[in-house]
Amino acid sequence: MANKVIKCKAAVAWEAGKPLSIEEIEVAPPKAHEVRIKIFATAVCHTDAYTLSGADPEGCFPVILGHEGAGIVESVGEGVTNLKAGDTVIPLYIPQCGECKFCLNPKTNLCQKIRVTQGKGLMPDGTSRFTCKGKTILHYMGTSTFSEYTVVADISVAKIDPSAPLDKVCLLGCGISTGYGAALNTAKVEPGSTCAVFGLGGVGLAAIMGCKAAGASRIIAVDINKDKFARAKEFGATECINPQDFSKPIQEVLVEKTDGGVDYSFECIGNVKVMRAALEACHKGWGVSVVVGVAGAGEEISTRPFQLVTGRTWKGTAFGGWKSVESVPKLVSEYMSKKINVDEFVTNTLSFDQINEAFELMHSGKSIRTVVKI
């Protein structure tokens, strides 16, 4: 099948705000420096829902969503030397070409080699590999994992341990790595520090896990859904706070509870008001707040400049700061050696035909991550 078009099932988003539709699509063979992957498992993330809602300024339709997947290489295009058919892989929405000025700078993981075309839903040559009912279907985040087969750039693939369970490690393609790395790489949480994590979805729980791994002595979990508190404590939170239980702003509550504020805070929701609260909950002189959640298009953050003048730092992170191609295999190895939790994030497993139910579960707040077996 290496040089042939493959017909397979995919969940197509024909337009914004409508449920996904399981369709038979055609997947063209990989061109030069591309890889065709058989996807075995994918998770559903808030970013997929954000794009499907129509709020994403880069959202284009019709499209095959999905960016937390894992599978096996089916075939490779001309010039691909780092991968071969049969390799176990995780597709990456942030590539690592190793050559652009971003890849060569140790301060960032934001490879820009294919950013322009990826943002338009196209492969690096400006075309798509997907068609359905005679129409071109766009790619998503360079990955499109809601399909039995997908085609990605060879710089957007991490080769991983072939014994890793794909229905678990697919989560390392986004959420877990993002939260975990926000604590370890972006904030660089230190032993004995006090941390606050706002938002206890998958990313927030992973941030708690990262704070614990870094040796934080106090980890305060903040959410308006108290049903999430027990799980937060399982991941390492030392205490949990519901802002709705207080008559004053949550940042004031945290400053009082922590003798002046936390050393590190993490906003894992994408709410600009919470981003402000997370910054203002930080300790004067050295507190660091990391924006992890993605806010809606056009939204802006605000605070009094005095908050920054007096020594607080506001930072942002994408994919937890991990340089993807080199880091994801290491994260999989850490999971295999039980250094990081992954299984505990999977609260539901569904069949491909039930993919719309996965979105419903996520919106209900009752699941952390739902894995869809393709």
From Swiss-Prot:
Zn(2+) 1 binds at C45, H67, C174. The modification N-acetylalanine is found at A2. It holds the Pfam family ADH_N. The keyword Zinc-finger does not apply. It comes from the Eukaryota. Binds 2 Zn(2+) ions per subunit. It is found in: Cytoplasm. The record marks R115 as: Important for FDH activity and activation by fatty acids. Disulfide bonds: none annotated. Keywords: Acetylation, Cytoplasm, Lipid metabolism, Metal-binding, NAD, Oxidoreductase, Phosphoprotein, Zinc. One of its GO terms (molecular function) is S-(hydroxymethyl)glutathione dehydrogenase (NADP+) activity. GO terms for biological process: fatty acid omega-oxidation; formaldehyde catabolic process. Gene3D superfamilies: Medium-chain alcohol dehydrogenases, catalytic domain (3.90.180.10), NAD(P)-binding Rossmann-like Domain (3.40.50.720). Zn(2+) 2 binds at C97, C100, C103, C111. GO terms for cellular component: cytosol. It catalyses: a primary alcohol + NAD(+) = an aldehyde + NADH + H(+); a secondary alcohol + NAD(+) = a ketone + NADH + H(+); S-(hydroxymethyl)glutathione + NADP(+) = S-formylglutathione + NADPH + H(+); S-(hydroxymethyl)glutathione + NAD(+) = S-formylglutathione + NADH + H(+). Its cofactor is Zn(2+). Catalyzes the oxidation of long-chain primary alcohols and the oxidation of S-(hydroxymethyl) glutathione. Also oxidizes long chain omega-hydroxy fatty acids, such as 20-HETE, producing both the intermediate aldehyde, 20-oxoarachidonate and the end product, a dicarboxylic acid, (5Z,8Z,11Z,14Z)-eicosatetraenedioate. Class-III ADH is remarkably ineffective in oxidizing ethanol. Required for clearance of cellular formaldehyde, a cytotoxic and carcinogenic metabolite that induces DNA damage. Belongs to the zinc-containing alcohol dehydrogenase family. Class-III subfamily. NCBIfam families: adh_III_F_hyde. Homodimer. This is Alcohol dehydrogenase class-3. It comes from Oryctolagus cuniculus (Rabbit). The gene is ADH5.
